[in-house]
Amino acid sequence: MIKGIGLDMIDLERVKQVLEKNPRFIERVLTEKEIKQFEKYEGSRKIEFLAGRFAAKEAYAKANGTGFGKHLSFTDVEILQVEDGRPHVTMPIKSGETVFVSITHTARSAAAQVIIEI
């Protein structure tokens, strides 16, 4: 049974501008393991990665029905690439839940969809 579906989209230029003004934005959005993956990339691919993770985490919060705030922050949600390159939510996963995530990019935006199944 589906618990929730979340969808989010973000403009790459917006993420680039935020990152230029506040380099610590990375630490507010990404976990330590995600930062290690982020640091492997260069140039525009870094912005795509960060924007994709931001959108995926927003989509997760929507699918979870909580949004971000008092009980959930960006760094509470971790999305890592598995060996075949797919994104995989590694935390938080509640017992009995399966989380599906898809991230995509265009030249101007990143989007993500999350489905939580119980």
Swiss-Prot record:
GO molecular function: holo-[acyl-carrier-protein] synthase activity; magnesium ion binding
Catalytic reactions of this protein: apo-[ACP] + CoA = holo-[ACP] + adenosine 3',5'-bisphosphate + H(+)
Pfam families linked: ACPS
GO CC list: cytoplasm
Top-level EC class as recorded in UniProt: transferase
Domain of life: Bacteria
Cofactor(s) listed in the protein's UniProt record: Mg(2+)
Task performed by this protein: Transfers the 4'-phosphopantetheine moiety from coenzyme A to a Ser of acyl-carrier-protein.
Protein family: Belongs to the P-Pant transferase superfamily. AcpS family.
Protein name from the UniProt record: Holo-[acyl-carrier-protein] synthase
Organism: Listeria welshimeri serovar 6b (strain ATCC 35897 / DSM 20650 / CCUG 15529 / CIP 8149 / NCTC 11857 / SLCC 5334 / V8)
Lineage: Bacteria, Bacillati, Bacillota, Bacilli, Bacillales
Gene (name only): acpS
